[in-house]
């Protein structure tokens, strides 16, 4: 009889591995993940889909370091129009959004590119929250409109 108390799908529960088994995170691993995310987003753009919520929290990683983009709850098909204007007011992840999304509610593949830049910042800061010094929507919007950009993340070198 098979032991079903720890099925294969939950093999990564907290405490089921030893620290010595965990691989060290390297720059090449982060670059590999960044590349895979870019290819996934390139595929979505080729299918005329705007993700609308690209963030590190919406990236899954398989056992063999394959990246999967997930959470398509805010995704839109832009097959007939290269932009999507959001008309319904719902809570959105402002810190990951392009200026045109925050100010005008306009989403496009270019706004996904902005979000990808924030994901890169998350990767190379080892999952720090973007814009940690800004607490509210108005402050972020005003700073971005005045030209503010996040500084280089701590673990990115000049070549990245």
Regions found by a protein language model. Name each.
Residues 1-160:
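Intracellular eukaryotic protein kinase-like catalytic domain
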